[in-house]
C-alpha cells in the first residue's frame, strides 16, 4: 500500500520547487501526499498545488484542509513574492504519474510519458503502461502502431522520468468513478459522449480561497510600504469543467 512519505520521481524547478519544499512536509503531516506544484499566469498568478490521499482520493473538504494548513506557512515564507491565487486541487482523472505506486495503481491504462534523457533517440512515448519492475526502476509500455522491425514493448527507466500523465478515455473515466478518485458528473457515471474529447478537460476537485498578497515592501528612502500590485480579477484557473467548478469550488 502506498505511503504518504513515498518519494516522487519528478521534481519542480525555480519558484515551484521552493513552494514544493515548503509545503510537502505539512501536507504529509496531514496524511496526504503532494502530487505537483505548478505556477501559472492564468487570471492572475496562480500557485496550483495538487494533493491526494495515499489511496488516490481527494475531496473538496480535504482540499480545504490542506489549503488552510499551508496558507499561513506560505505567508510566512513568502516564496512567490508577488500577489497570487492559491489553488489546492485533486490530481483529476488524467492525473500526473509521479510515484512508482501511481504506475502500479494505473497499470493497464493509456499514458503519455516524457523522459528527461532520450531513450534510443526518443523522449516521448504514448501507450498502455504495465506493472513496474519489482525494484521500481522501470515501467513497461506497450506501444500501438509501431513500424515493422521495431519493438512493440519498451521498458522505460523511471530514474529518467521527466513527466507522465494518464490519457483521458471513457474507460479511464469509468474506472476513476468506480474507485472514487473522480467526482461524479451531474449524478452520471461518466459522460461517454464528451469523455475523450480533450486530455485537459478532466474535472478536478478544487479549493480556491481569496487571493494571497505579498508582504509589504518598504521604500528604502521613506521607510513607507510600497504599494503592491493588485491581482487580476477572477477566482483561480477557469476550466472547461464549468459544472464541476460551480458545484465544488469554494470561495
From Swiss-Prot:
UniProtKB keywords: Cytoplasm, Ribosome biogenesis
Spell out the Basic and acidic residues composition-biased ranges.
216-226
Localization in the cell: Cytoplasm
What are the BP-aspect GO terms?
Answer: ribosomal small subunit assembly; translation
Pfam families (alphabetical): DUF150_C, RimP_N
One GO term describing the cellular component: cytosol
| Region spans: Disordered | 176-251
Name the InterPro entries for this protein. Ribosome_maturation_RimP, RimP_C, RimP_C_sf, RimP_N, RimP_N_sf
Locations of Acidic residues compositional bias?
Answer: 186-196
Q: CDD domains from the xrefs? A: YlxS_C
The family note in this entry says: Belongs to the RimP family.
**Described purpose of this protein according to its UniProt entry:** Required for maturation of 30S ribosomal subunits.
Q: What is this protein called?
A: Ribosome maturation factor RimP
Q: Which organism is it from?
A: Methylorubrum extorquens (strain PA1)
Amino acid at each position: 500500500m502506498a505511503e504518504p512519505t513515498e518519494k516522487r520521481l519528478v521534481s519542480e524547478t525555480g519558484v515551484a520547487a521552493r513552494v514544493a519544499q515548503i509545503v510537502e512536509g505539512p501536507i504529509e503531516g496531514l496524511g496526504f501526499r503532494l502530487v505537483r506544484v505548478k505556477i501559472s499566469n492564468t487570471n492572475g498568478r496562480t500557485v496550483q498545488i495538487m494533493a491526494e490521499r495515499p489511496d488516490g482520493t481527494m475531496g473538496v473538504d480535504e482540499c480545504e484542509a490542506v489549503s488552510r494548513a499551508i496558507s499561513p506557512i506560505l505567508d510566512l515564507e513568502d516564496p512567490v513574492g508577488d500577489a497570487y491565487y492559491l489553488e489546492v486541487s485533486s490530481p483529476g482523472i488524467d492525473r500526473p504519474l509521479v510515484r512508482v505506486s501511481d504506475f502500479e495503481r494505473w497499470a493497464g491504462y493509456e499514458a503519455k510519458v516524457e523522459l528527461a534523457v532520450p531513450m534510443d533517440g526518443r523522449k516521448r512515448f504514448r501507450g498502455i503502461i504495465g506493472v513496474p519492475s519489482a525494484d521500481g526502476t522501470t515501467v513497461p509500455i506497450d506501444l500501438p502502431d509501431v513500424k515493422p522491425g521495431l519493438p512493440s514493448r519498451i521498458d522505460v527507466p523511471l530514474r529518467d522520468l521527466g513527466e507522465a500523465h494518464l490519457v483521458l478515455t471513457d474507460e479511464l473515466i469509468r474506472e476513476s468513478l468506480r474507485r472514487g478518485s473522480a467526482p461524479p458528473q451531474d449524478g452520471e457515471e461518466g459522460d461517454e459522449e464528451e469523455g475523450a474529447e480533450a486530455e485537459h478537460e478532466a474535472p478536478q476537485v478544487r479549493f480556491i480561497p481569496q487571493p494571497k498578497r505579498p508582504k509589504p515592501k518598504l521604500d528604502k528612502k521613506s521607510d513607507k510600504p510600497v504599494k503592491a500590485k493588485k491581482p487580476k480579477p477572477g477566482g483561480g484557473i477557469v476550466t472547461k469543467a464549468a459544472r464541476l467548478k460551480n458545484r465544488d469550488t469554494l470561495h
